[in-house]
Amino acid sequence: MTDKEQVVIYTDGACKGNPGRGGWGALLLYKGAERELWGGEPDTTNNRMELMAAIQALAALKRSCPIRLITDSEYVMRGITEWLPNWKKRGWKTASKQPVKNADLWQALDEQVARHQVEWQWVRGHTGDPGNERADQLANRGVAELPR
């Protein structure tokens, strides 16, 4: 599958204090078109914002399509590709029988992923990748636009 046939999505989360004021950002690219999404929450964590970025980006797509979603979050990457199937089998419990943190968002992400054909890709953050840098700027905008 070529990039021209896929929607390419870059996502990022930001948090000022952890927990604290947080934001999420997503850059969606398709056939030369771009769409920017961002938002924020007054009391959240970086991991929740990373998850929100992916959820909101996938939810913004009105119909099922092939996607390459690029994140700099090892938490999101490992969660969706390694941990989630076992959490579901165990009734949203970890291997140590503890409740999964952020289960509400993992469940929402799982629902969105089921609508599409998603290829996940991890990229190291803050290394100059243009899409990742834009997603980071959008996440910080989400924090900046929160009411004081």
Swiss-Prot record:
Its cofactor is Mg(2+). Keywords: Cytoplasm, Endonuclease, Hydrolase, Magnesium, Metal-binding, Nuclease. GO terms for molecular function: magnesium ion binding; nucleic acid binding; RNA-DNA hybrid ribonuclease activity. Binds 1 Mg(2+) ion per subunit. May bind a second metal ion at a regulatory site, or after substrate binding. It is an enzyme of class 3 (hydrolase). Mg(2+) 2 binds at D12, D136. Residues 3-144 form the RNase H type-1 domain. It is found in: Cytoplasm. Mg(2+) 1 binds at D12, E50, D72. CDD domains: RNase_HI_prokaryote_like (cd09278). Residues 125-148 are annotated as: Disordered. One of its GO terms (cellular component) is cytoplasm. GO terms for biological process: DNA replication, removal of RNA primer. It catalyses: Endonucleolytic cleavage to 5'-phosphomonoester. Its EC number is 3.1.26.4. It comes from the Bacteria. It holds the Pfam family RNase_H. Monomer. Belongs to the RNase H family. HAMAP family: RNase_H. Endonuclease that specifically degrades the RNA of RNA-DNA hybrids. This is Ribonuclease HI. It comes from Pseudomonas aeruginosa (strain ATCC 15692 / DSM 22644 / CIP 104116 / JCM 14847 / LMG 12228 / 1C / PRS 101 / PAO1).
